[in-house]
Amino acid sequence: MVDTLGNMRRTHTCNELSAASAGTEVVLAGWVQRRRDHGGVIFVDLRDREGITQVVFNPDREPAVHAKAHDIRNEYVICVKGKVEKRPDDMVNPKLTTGEIEVAASELAILNTAKTPPFMVEDRIDVSESIRLKHRFVDLRRPAMQKNLLARHRAGMAAREFLNSQGFLDIETPFLTRNTPEGARDYLVPSRVNPGAFYALPQSPQLFKQMLMVAGFDRYYQIVRCFRDEDLRADRQPEFTQIDLEMSFVGEEDVMAIGEGLVANVVRQVTGEAVDLPFSRMTYDQAMADYGLDKPDLRFDMKLVDITDIAAGCGFQVFSGAVKNGGIVKALNAKGCADFTRKELDDYTEFVAIYKARGLAWVKVREDGWQSPIAKFFTDDEKASMAQRLNMAVGDLVFFGADAASVVNDSLGNLRNRIGERLGLVDKNRMCFLWVTDFPFFEYDETEKRYQAKHHPFTAPHEADMEHLHTDPEAVRSRAYDLVLNGTEIGGGSIRIHNRQVQEKMFEALGLAPEDYTAKFGFLLDALDSGAPPHGGMAFGFDRLVMLLCGESSIREVIAFPKTQKAACALTDAPSPADKKQLDELFIKVTADINKE
């Protein structure tokens, strides 16, 4: 039998009382973190989202209340009335904000019991993530999780505060929209009242926010849920949140300035740290040349170096052959790492294979020259040229990649990050923001054998590059920009196309016939033909930003109820089969049995 609250109402949180509160009668409510019986006196650590307060049940003062406290167990929900007392000097707990006081209980209500939890409600737990997600309501009681979700709340409040102060309007856009199959797969929602037709859940509010600019709202924002049916990684979820914004009558610098101000306010409100403005800038071409990735981590200095010209005529067929086939050769100098073991070198070779590299050549620089299986293939002049360009010194370890540019950049760029972590070169306490600009408009899809938009087809191209549209599409740069924090993309955007004729040209360059793009995007073209202002915007990955500010490695740690790596909810067992009646109403027939292996 459990109690009711009765007339007791909480007066303070469990992190609010101090020595100055001594003598005050208070009412606290929360969960039992721990119960201890010391020679008849029962001590209970009472926990709520704010912290912990020690409650004392003394048999000499309140025998009936003390007797009732014998029934208390971990995670019981209780309400306690009592008087705040200073602890004896030898019992002060400096680890608690409330460590100078305790509450001497005079009344106790056991509001609910609790079965033994699957794991302790504390930060240091040795339990699998699957069990944590299955019992998320228990997992979320842990201080670390409560701290993360509080940080998420503060980040959202800070974003709204800043954007409101800059004249942005918070406007909602539809979740049920039309399917426009570009990029990642859409989640489809069948329409009962329109048999055979489907809505799509939005991957972003992109087209609707452009409509709002055409409608004259000037500045829009939304902290919005988006959906993508794609394979998951540590920083991806099928449903995710972004801070979305759009502005009229602007160029890149205007949008980027707003983005910097927003991020600075979020960081200050969440971490208390100031951010140096403006952020660093780097073009896409520069990022790829020096770091191999379009989201470089600038917290440590280790650049890729192109040696294609030196390798072109060398005797090592792997290098010269790659150049002959239109590829490149790059090198990465890991200073002072010549003592890496063969096992470590083999591990790195396996690592770059993830990024389609077919091998990893290396050279250790010793007092007596190069130590490497490939040393014999190079002339003294070639060695001297590489040594000078790569700043090679005794004790260095140099890695080489030779293949198509995309493979070399991807493999060595990620190897750079891995070695930086391995050597402890990454300053974990530093936040390094970077704008990457001037992305290619197109990227070639080897699978579909056609060009696709690198960002999305509504991004404006650089006007000066339009002459290359049909002769050299890869030379066309977009007016796009990504914001990178410590090697992770946290936001991206662009100036949009606001002219119908230009938009149609870009659709056609992507291989869409007029009847196709009119069917899919006719409403956008009509809007662009109805007085569309120049406009641009961006979106921030809210989950990812909060993850980085909290020092976590997965966005699942900053989302209350995340999906698993298989896009499932371990708590509710979603997705689940629908019954036949529901499917019949939707004119859907399931042809595969999901219960079969």
From Swiss-Prot:
Keywords attached to this Swiss-Prot or TrEMBL record, sorted alphabetically, are: Aminoacyl-tRNA synthetase, ATP-binding, Cytoplasm, Ligase, Nucleotide-binding, Protein biosynthesis
Coarse class of the protein's main subcellular location? cytoplasm
- Show the GO MF annotations: aspartate-tRNA ligase activity; aspartate-tRNA(Asn) ligase activity; ATP binding; nucleic acid binding
| Main enzyme class | ligase
- UniProt xrefs under InterPro entries: Aa-tRNA-synt_II (IPR004364), aa-tRNA-synth_II (IPR006195), aa-tRNA-synth_II/BPL/LPL (IPR045864), Asp-tRNA-ligase_1 (IPR004524), Asp-tRNA-ligase_1_N (IPR047089), Asp/Asn-tRNA-synth_IIb (IPR002312), AspRS_core (IPR047090), GAD-like_sf (IPR004115)
**Entry's EC annotation:** 6.1.1.23
Kindly list the positions annotated as binding L-aspartate: E182, R228, H455, R496
Residues reported in the UniProt entry to bind ATP: R228, D229, E230, Q237, E489, G541, F542, D543, R544
Got any disulfides in this one, which pairs?
Answer: none
Which parts of this chain are annotated as the region Aspartate?
A: 206-209
Where does it reside?
Answer: Cytoplasm
User: Which reactions does this protein catalyse?
Assistant: tRNA(Asx) + L-aspartate + ATP = L-aspartyl-tRNA(Asx) + AMP + diphosphate
Q: Which Pfam families match?
A: GAD, tRNA-synt_2, tRNA_anti-codon
Quaternary structure, per UniProt, is:
Homodimer.
Q: Any idea what job this protein has? A: Aspartyl-tRNA synthetase with relaxed tRNA specificity since it is able to aspartylate not only its cognate tRNA(Asp) but also tRNA(Asn). Reaction proceeds in two steps: L-aspartate is first activated by ATP to form Asp-AMP and then transferred to the acceptor end of tRNA(Asp/Asn).
Instruction: Please state which protein family the record places this protein in.
Output: Belongs to the class-II aminoacyl-tRNA synthetase family. Type 1 subfamily.
Protein name according to UniProt: Aspartate--tRNA(Asp/Asn) ligase
Species name: Desulfosudis oleivorans (strain DSM 6200 / JCM 39069 / Hxd3)
